[in-house]
């Protein structure tokens, strides 16, 4: 084999190896793992909570006091988090893109053992991931946050609160509401888990988004393939 041809072949092999090894090294040795999905912290069971739950079920005088104490408006707290999660493949290496923000505002209203209203707004311009390149794509081509800077959700139907929920147990419900994202408005059903802990209400869940249904263009780029859907995750904390 002639030296010139051998050098060209060796160079081509190095380029090919680099194209495969580079993403593997980045994803497995350099890139931080995607954060875990947003979830409620494990509940702590106490005899006090059990006693309160029993009193609520029995509709005692103490139970009435507990129920009336939660009535009113609850406001989204600063530590609330909303974000996206999408599966990516970078040159045959699987990973996840995750971006989050705490720029969330909203209120939740409780009256007569029902959640009678809830809405929140997210400042989509503040979403941040572990990649500035991804953030630029999200803010421009993908979500066009200059044109659509916020996303909103408004609950459309009340939710009945069980005695256990009022006593502090985890409460699962399907909520019907209206989501507006990237200029598209749709009625959706969201399954969530909620918990009342003292003067804090926590609400956790996720919404599957098929990108085409929300006028979101294919997020893929040369060398990066993104699935055609992702998750809109949220962990909201409401306080007085």
Regions found by a protein language model. Give the residues of each.
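Low-complexity, acidic/polar, glycine-enriched regions of mature
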Residues: 2-240
């Amino acid at each position: 084999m002639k030296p010139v041809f051998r050098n060209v072949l060796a160079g081509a092999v190095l380029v090919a190896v680099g194209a495969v090894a580079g993403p593997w090294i980045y994803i497995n040795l350099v890139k931080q793992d995607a954060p875990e999905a947003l979830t409620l912290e494990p509940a702590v069971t106490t005899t006090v909570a059990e006693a309160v739950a029993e009193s609520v079920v029995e509709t005692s005088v103490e139970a009435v006091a507990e129920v009336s104490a939660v009535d009113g408006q609850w406001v989204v707290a600063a530590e609330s988090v909303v974000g996206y999660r999408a599966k990516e493949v970078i040159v045959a290496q699987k990973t996840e893109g995750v971006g989050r923000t705490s720029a969330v505002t909203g209120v939740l209203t409780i009256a007569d053992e029902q959640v009678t209203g809830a809405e929140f707004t997210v400042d989509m311009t503040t979403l941040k991931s572990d990649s500035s390149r991804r953030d630029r794509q999200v803010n421009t081509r993908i979500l066009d946050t200059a044109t659509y800077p916020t996303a909103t959700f408004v609950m459309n139907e009340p939710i009945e609160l069980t005695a256990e929920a009022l006593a502090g147990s985890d409460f699962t419900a399907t909520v019907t509401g209206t989501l507006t994202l990237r200029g598209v408005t749709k009625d959706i059903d969201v399954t969530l888990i909620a918990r009342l802990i003292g003067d804090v209400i926590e609400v956790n869940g996720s919404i599957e988004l098929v990108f085409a249904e929300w006028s979101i263009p294919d997020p893929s780029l040369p060398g990066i393939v993104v699935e055609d859907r992702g998750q809109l995750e949220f962990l909201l904390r409401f306080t007085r």
